[in-house]
Structure formats: C-alpha cells, structure tokens
Amino acid sequence: MDPRRAGRGAALCEEQGIALLPFAPLGRGFLTGRFSSFDDLPQDDFRRRLPRFQQDALRANLAIVGRVRQVAEPVGATPAQVALAWLLAEGRYVVPIPGTKTPKYLTDNAGAADVELSAADLAELDALPAPEGARY
C-alpha cells in the first residue's frame, strides 16, 4: 500500500479506533530485491499476468524501487524495511501485513520497526511517482 493513498482513510481509522491493514505492502515482491526483470519470475508465477509486472511497467516500477533503495542505504535498511517503516509512520492504527515466506523475510520485516525515517526521508518517499500499471 502506498501511504499517499491512505490519506484521509488512515486519519479516519485512527479517529474511530479502527486498524488499517495495508495488503501487499511490499508490492508483491517489488521491494524485496528478489527480481530485477520479468525473466526472473518463475514461469508459473501469477505475477507474470499482473499489469504492474509487464515489461514496460516493470522497468518503471523497478526504477521506483531504486529510489526507495536510495533512502534505505543511508539509514542502514532494506527497501522493504523502508516501505514498512513508511507505512508505520502513518500512525499507530496502520498495521501493514507483509508476506513472510522465510525466516529471513520475518527478520527483515520485523527490522522495519527499528527504522527511523526523517522528515526529509518521508518527503522524498511521498514525492515518488505512483506505480505503473493496474494493480490486478
């Protein structure tokens, strides 16, 4: 989930004491660093059929990941941790639910709680372009 899309929804949830649970906050793997091209996806991977993973959209979206990486490196975090920390910065009622297939991903995802993003980092992330291609 892109925190910019939460907008008033996150604030309204907090006002009402309702949790907001962003689904697929790591962009279905974009932010994990597991692939850098369409060909890296297994032949039977459902993402091969999703618009955001088609060749042109994939290139544009991986460029966005590169910009997230530029925020992550100076704070000693991974792009996935920065994405989760960005969501956590939206407030205590925002609880991202990332996929966690391996112990390594569990450790990486949990590490997001220790990532401190500055106001400048948050502004840089907020200025990123929206992902290319429809979500589904």
Regions found by a protein language model. Give the residues of each.
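Beta/alpha (TIM)-barrel catalytic core signal, keyed to glycine-rich beta->alpha loops juxtaposed to Asp/Glu
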Residues: M1-Y136
